[in-house]
UniProtKB/Swiss-Prot annotation:
Extracellular side: 456-472, 535-567, 617-647
Catalytic activity from the UniProt record: H2O(in) = H2O(out); glycerol(in) = glycerol(out)
Entry keyword set: Glycoprotein, Membrane, Repeat, Transmembrane, Transmembrane helix, Transport
Coiled-coil residues: none
Bias (Low complexity): 252-265
Name assigned to this protein: Aquaglyceroporin-4
Ranges of Polar residues composition bias in the record: 87-96, 307-325, 360-370
Transmembrane segments: 435-455, 473-493, 514-534, 568-588, 596-616, 648-668
Amino acid sequence: MADEEIKPTSSIEAGGGQNNEHEHGMTSLPNLPSTREETPRELSPVAGSSRAQSTGEQGVKPLKRFDTLPTRRSQLSPDTRRRGRTLTGQVPQDNDLSSRRQVFRRGTSVLSGESGDRMRSIPERGPVPPTTERESRPSGVSDRTQASGLRPRRSTTSRQRGPSIRRRPTVALEAVTSGADVGGGDNFTLAGPAPIETSAQNQPYVDPGYAHLNPAYVQPENVRPVWGLAKPLPRVVRPGMIPSRTEINMAQQQQQQQQQQPQNQADVDLEQGRIEPTLKLSRISTALQNARQQRENNLMEAHGLVSPTNLQTTASRQEPLTAPSQVIEEEDLADKPTNTDTTSPERPPTRPPLSFDGRPSQTSQNSQNEPFPALSDHDDQESVATEVAGPDDLDGEWIGQEIPLVAYDPNYDDEIHNLHTHWSVIRLRFREPLAELLAVTCQLTLGFCADLVVVTSGKNASPAGNEATTDWAWGLASMLGIYIAGGISGAHLNPAISIMLWIYRGFPLRKVPMYVLAQILGAFIAALISFGLYQTNIVEYGGTDLKTSDTMGAFITYPRYPWINASTSFFTEFVGTAILAVAVLALGDDMNAPPGAGMSAFILGLVITVLSMAFGYNTGAALNPSRDLGPRLALAALGYGKDLFTDVYWIWGNWCAPILGAIFGAFLYDAAIFAGGESPVNYPRKRIKRAGHKWRKKWGVRLRKMKPAKKGEDEAYRRWKESQ
């Protein structure tokens, strides 16, 4: 019996059905002879079990099923989920699993490549079940929304109701970084929306004719540099990064000597990080000089000032530079309107080649008749475009005029503006000071009012807040100020930050006085507004004599307690502002870990909050010279007395300490982390001296021009200008 093969037979012959369980290879008992008369009857429309069908054929009346009982489905029905082990599907071969496909939210396709039909399961045994109406129907949600007028749901994929035997892909796809699932599986993440989707959602509606009437709205981003706290700081070329003619001449002579005496491999691979571990700085000084000369020679070669044949000395110098600190590649020179050839927009054809001594050749000087791009004479530290060679400008050593490195003209020639009224012209001229004024006024008004609320409610049974309340108020107020003016003036809100950015990031020196004046004026206005709003509370709290009202601490900062000496007060402001400067430079460094769009202001608001909590107990944590001087002037005008300026703490405590602290904090960050060439920390020592000498000479010329001219000097100056 064990070796006998049992053939599957059907227990339903009259109905023409087949028992699929026997076809699946399931063993069955041999058919026993039935003593009852078999009466053929129609199959029940309900897909019942084979037992019910067999009993019906044998003449037994089937049991009546009540409506409360669940409908019994056959396990062989295509609508019944199979128990036990199931087949897993295979991903189509033409499925694109690349990261780009997944970033653009295109899920795994379940359609065949040729016909486009839905991929059916591969049967284990038996024929392929036909496609049911339930499977072919996409979803009932879209049908209802079309009829009812509701907005269709686009965030989730239409999912079938009930069981299904359609095969599922087994390849693990990358999780989509958004809650909106378009064609993929159920991917849940806490990382927020994808950048592409976020940028699309933040785009507002724009009428078709709006761009024609307001062309400034559609101009490219980063048309002008903005040294601010709302986004990464700009990368500019500063005078210390550009070689002089003498340095070019010496570099060419050294290159010829190095061709005859090749250097050690350790020196060649210096910038690749392969440095021999040694404490002898003299062994790498030559490599440092060669690496710097190579970068400068690449600059000269790019602008046609040096022949490329003189630059190929070693194998490493033939490799292109890829360091992010080389900001020459970041300057968009093609957008600068110049009289250049359209075939090579990166350099004008009229640039004279340099001879061996680093100066233009005589033939090139004679043939040089076409005008060069006009370079404005403004701040020495903004960019190389500020440097125009003069008669006393290092004896013609400066080559900045021959290298078009500027991408922004401070005379607003590269921008498109919407000038509709007369005020729009004035606003364009003073847009940065106006933005700084508005931001400081809003920031300090909120801060002063929060302090007044806590001070004047101190005698009440339930005071309205405490010191922690004011700390959070100052942090959120600073965040608001950065959001207001971050894209226009940069929202420095602090003279110490403006001076620090001038020294270490090339912020124009000519803009520093305007920024400081706007910040002091904004603090003055904010103090007047706050006093006007809480005047009755101040009188109720301290009386009509403002000198003894004990509300001065809500406006200005000073040592809060008698045991806090001068050194403690000074270094409290010094350390607090140094940490603030480190945070500003870290958030503005695009090579470090800059936050996302719009997050810099929020993070700096939190930084101000924690600084107020940490350093506010000793002195009130001014961290800002204008935040103290503006209210002092306002309180003196309101009648708080002239004793506000008798104590010199407001000079060395609120001005010297924050400015020196910001400079020191920026030095620490650049010495430890920053690698850009615009920082003086990364200048060679000779370049620092040369830049200082050049800066003193230029400002000496400007001061001499401000003096009344003597007789005969005006004509000589006019002739010199015409010769240029």
